[in-house]
């Protein structure tokens, strides 16, 4: 749909002034009359642009420390006036049509994120006039263009040049969608913030409610439609958060390969989050959201080789994540050895990409290096509701471990215990992980009985010819009975790391002592469902 509308008059009022000077210059050069407010007007005037202050246009001054600037009939009449229908009344009241509104809002999110931000500070950064203009212009998109993102400035000028100073209805409608998304996200942030302040605001407590407001408003941006969801009869799409600061599958750049599937994204997230736990060069291989092989070494090539040995059968068609740049030697080893769905690493060398390009279906993603983990929320949908919790960023240090057995672990056992404890955090419960010399030996995942997870881990190790004797065993939660320790002893496990906390801890510790096993308590559980 063309339905072009010329842009003859624009109102500019922005908090984020990135690119606004150049955009205003481009509009002015194309004969567009500029209206503006406050700091934006002063900035444009300083740059020599012909700009009319809104207060001069309306004949009504800004007041109440800038709280009232644009809330005036001459402004909103000019925005909401329907061309060809409201012309007479606009002329009667000396209301000039405004064809474009360029607005972004007070930085509420940045304000409340600052340490020590008071409720009064937050309140003063709630924009009133801005959202009102945005919604007015978006409502009247048939006649008015609303611009809320500086990333649209260049495209708008190009379209105006291609259409003799006009914008099409398709463009105005797309801009209106962005505008309503913008105000919805803005109001959601304010509602979430105020909802989390309720007890403190009413004097019921000195503390605010915390991370969980009484109404939770979420805004995600669609990154891509999927061919289908977890199964082919389910429709699906991938949505991401705005301004994600941590390297993630959501922010990763796909270098090559087919479009990512729903299951690819879920599994890649599991692999990447696991590999982030390690400081040394590490490799994590994931299948169906569970690690099937993990190792750390002096190079990612050796880490991959050792991770693959844990379970070559399950590694087929898996997801492989690294915490170092993917190099040519490692890429060649993977491509020549196995079928892989996705490779993800902070970066990939040009030589590595030349090698992976020979397998065009292999998806290669780079996510950038990460410095730290960013606290956030995890969500789990249930029928009729949503479970919300903090991300599980907990991880014990060596100094926080408690040895509860008679025998102390050796230095190697301690290293292996810490290693497999990190892996167990990412294995579906009930989770058991055997590890030795910084590589997984066997992984038992997702069993209803913890002792059966232990048995499966030992079976997997035996199937691959890996020696369990002398390995460490991690359990994501406490052992309710001694049978898990007896099963571990039967295959030669020499050290067990677990949270502790069972009413039968004494029996479990006694079993470890009976078998000469060193037992370590973390006092931290890592259920994963």
Curated annotation (Swiss-Prot):
One of its GO terms (biological process) is 'de novo' IMP biosynthetic process. Belongs to the PurH family. It catalyses: (6R)-10-formyltetrahydrofolate + 5-amino-1-(5-phospho-beta-D-ribosyl)imidazole-4-carboxamide = 5-formamido-1-(5-phospho-D-ribosyl)imidazole-4-carboxamide + (6S)-5,6,7,8-tetrahydrofolate; IMP + H2O = 5-formamido-1-(5-phospho-D-ribosyl)imidazole-4-carboxamide. Residues 1-148 form the MGS-like domain. It holds the Pfam family AICARFT_IMPCHas. Its EC number is 2.1.2.3, 3.5.4.10. The IMP cyclohydrolase activity resides in the N-terminal region. It comes from the Bacteria. One of its GO terms (cellular component) is cytosol. Pathway: Purine metabolism; IMP biosynthesis via de novo pathway; 5-formamido-1-(5-phospho-D-ribosyl)imidazole-4-carboxamide from 5-amino-1-(5-phospho-D-ribosyl)imidazole-4-carboxamide (10-formyl THF route): step 1/1; Purine metabolism; IMP biosynthesis via de novo pathway; IMP from 5-formamido-1-(5-phospho-D-ribosyl)imidazole-4-carboxamide: step 1/1. Coiled coil: none annotated. This is Bifunctional purine biosynthesis protein PurH. SMART domains: AICARFT_IMPCHas, MGS. GO terms for molecular function: IMP cyclohydrolase activity; phosphoribosylaminoimidazolecarboxamide formyltransferase activity. It comes from Salmonella typhi. The keyword Hydrolase applies.
